[in-house]
Structure formats: C-alpha cells, structure tokens
C-alpha cells in the first residue's frame, strides 16, 4: 500500500480472462493502485477477441504501453486461467527464467518465506539462471522434464518451494500450482522492499550472478505440413 501511496504506477492486463475481478480487488481496491491500473478486466467468453497469452506477441497492448512515453513503473499480465505471468518495467522485459531466479534470490524479503525455503526447480528448457542463485544460497536446484506434475512431486516431498518454466509459468508450494497473481505480488514486494525499479533489480542481479542467454522459437499460424517438416528436422538434429 505504501508503494502506491507514494505515487508508484502499474499497468496490469487481465486480457479479458479469469483474473480480472481478482486483480481489481487486489491491486486497485486493497493495495491502492490508481483507478484504471487494471485493464481488460472483464472476463469474456471469447476474451474480447484477444489471445490471452502473456508474452511479447499477444500482450502487445501492454508491451506498447510499457515501451511508450510516460510508461507506468511496472507492467504485468496473466493468461486465460491466471497461472502464467509476464513482468515488465519501463522499456524493459524480464524473461521468465530471470524472473524465477530473481524471485528465488529475494525470497527473504517476503514474510511467508523469511524463515527459509526448501529449494527450487526449473524445467529442462528454462535457463540456468536460477541454478546459480540456488548455489549461492546453498539450496537444492532440480531440472525436470516439461510438465507441471514433476514440480508437484518435488513439492509434495518438501524438496522445493519455488518452481518455474520458460513458458511464463511460476509457482510455489502454497498451492502446488502456477499462480500468476502470486508472481506479480512477489515482484511488487521486491520493488517495495528495495525501492528499485524492475530494470535496476534485474541489472543488479545480472551483475551479481551473470546473465544467461537462450533462445526460444515460436512458430505461429503454420500449416500442418510445415509443422511436420519442422518436427522431422528437429528429430534429425536431436532436438
């Protein structure tokens, strides 16, 4: 609340999906974000023609706002069922892999985790950024195949508390699932506790731990024939 009382601004795009009413209640009514901070807040059967996928392509309205003039201090979006999230600063995008690493590095800033966490896990396709953080904090770090069930097994056996994947999913053992609003609130807590911007937090993280570079290819709107050829080529090269 103090963050917003001091003039902090944010833009949260609910993408006409399920998180809209929750976001309005949490961010604007409880925390005091300025009215209008939450956009596309009404859940619609067709998502208002939007594709509720929180990435740089489908959350274009949010991205344009955050990279434009007079951008809010913080930007975020969740997907159709609220489990995935995207984090942005002014003219700055945080990759899901870096977000997981930064969340893990700052767990002690959050009251619920100040007494410690069990460990962390990432999908095999997610960068090693979180692994370096885990090593510094003397926490176990697991790499698992793609599929949330593998994270759940680790949470159930109390081996991890946080987990995430490069496809914008981040979660915690508090519900054993991906939780997009939880991730957004975690970032707001980091900002409030440190007094730093999204970019400053991320740049300082890179300076301390190094930066991981990786590449993801998304093929949109291609024919089945082309998709089959891509799969065959991937198999040929061991992908």
Name the predicted role of every residue range.
Residues 196-239:
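Catalytic-core signal marking the mid-to-C-terminal active-site face
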């Amino acid at each position: 609340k103090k963050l917003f009382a001091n003039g902090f601004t944010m833009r949260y795009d609910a993408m006409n999906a399920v998180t809209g009413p929750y976001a309005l209640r949490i961010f604007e009514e409880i925390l005091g974000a300025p009215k209008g901070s939450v956009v596309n807040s009404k859940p619609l059967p067709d998502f208002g023609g939007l594709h509720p996928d929180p990435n740089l392509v489908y959350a274009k309205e949010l991205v344009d706002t955050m990279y434009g003039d007079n951008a809010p201090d913080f930007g975020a979006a969740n997907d159709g069922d609220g489990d995935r999230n995207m984090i942005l600063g002014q003219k700055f995008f945080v990759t899901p892999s870096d977000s997981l690493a930064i969340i893990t590095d700052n767990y002690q800033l959050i009251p619920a985790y100040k007494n410690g966490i069990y460990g962390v896990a990432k999908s095999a396709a997610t960068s090693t950024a979180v692994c370096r953080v885990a090593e510094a904090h003397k926490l176990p770090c697991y790499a698992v195949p793609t599929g949330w069930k593998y994270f759940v097994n680790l949470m159930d056996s109390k081996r991890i508390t946080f987990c995430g994947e490069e496809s914008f999913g981040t979660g915690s053992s508090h519900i054993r699932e991906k939780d997009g609003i939880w991730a957004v609130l975690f970032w707001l807590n980091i900002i409030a506790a440190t007094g730093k911007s999204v970019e400053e937090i991320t740049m300082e993280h890179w300076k301390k731990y190094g930066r991981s570079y990786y590449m993801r290819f998304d093929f949109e709107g291609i024919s089945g024939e082309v998709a089959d050829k891509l799969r065959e080529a991937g198999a040929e090269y061991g992908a």
